[in-house]
Amino acid sequence: LYTDILKFDSRNPEWDGRDRFILSKGHAGASVYAAIAENGFFDVAELKTHYANGSRLSGHVSHHVPGIDFSTGSLGHGLPVATGRALAAKQNGKLYRSFVVMGDGECNEGSVWEAAEFANHYKLDNLVAIVDHNHMQSLDYCNNTLEVDMAKRWEGFGWNVIEVDGHNHDELRNALNDTSNSEHKPTVVIAHTVKGKGISFMEMDILWHYRFPHDGWEYNCAVNELHKTKPEGVVDPYTPNGCPEKEEKPE
């Protein structure tokens, strides 16, 4: 989004012509903070204050941070707000688009489908939802809570549906660029993802939905495996001297 899709000006975060972006799954705020810091909204060094007492980089995204359009955390609110902003753009003759990233578990919220129906009725082709379809929510797998065919549900609400591998940047980029051909429909990009991707002992394990790795084997193994996914030449500011030595898992 921040490298190829969104229109924004980090020197003027409130620029009226910017595209609007809402991270509805606000608990994933660390990823957005990293992206906007790298794009000049604030100093990258401030990322080290994330979650610290008194830091503006709270666990859920806050509009007090430059580049954040809407505070989120209470699920089910992002799409309704993005829908309202898309309608406002249409009514005011503005060319900006509204983007919202949501979780698949979040799609259990009734407010999501009220907004989806509204967006279809008003032909909001300047609205793009991205659903992180990792099949997990809170403390269980999505299908154990409410089994839904995600693509068919959105199609039933009249949306233009695109499905992609959420770990493939080219597929994501192409899908988001294709939304301009949506025939006066809002677009949803369903990004199929793997929770804990790249870390062998975390992938698709519900245990890790609310856990963080402890010091020692868990942390060192996770960092080592993540480094294997890092593009060559990219420097990690948190481990500038390389990752810790891999350890054997304790018995």
What are these regions (language model features)?
Residues 109-134, 188-190:
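A short alpha/beta connector and helix-capping loop motif
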Residues 1-121, 146:
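Cofactor-binding active-site loop characterized by glycine-rich and histidine/acidic residues
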